């Protein structure tokens, strides 16, 4: 569960960076 939470946070951060990059 902890691992999934960390991976989820990393995925969310990557999504935010990706969206900013697209903008």
From Swiss-Prot:
Q: Where in the cell is it found?
A: Secreted
A single cellular component GO annotation: extracellular region
Q: Where does it mainly reside?
A: secreted
Q: In which tissues is it expressed?
A: Expressed in skin glands.
* Keywords from the named record: Secreted
Q: What does this protein do?
A: May act as an antimicrobial peptide.
Say which family it is in: Belongs to the Frog skin active peptide (FSAP) family. Septenin subfamily.
Q: What is this protein called?
A: Septenin 2a
Q: Which organism is it from?
A: Osteopilus septentrionalis (Cuban treefrog)
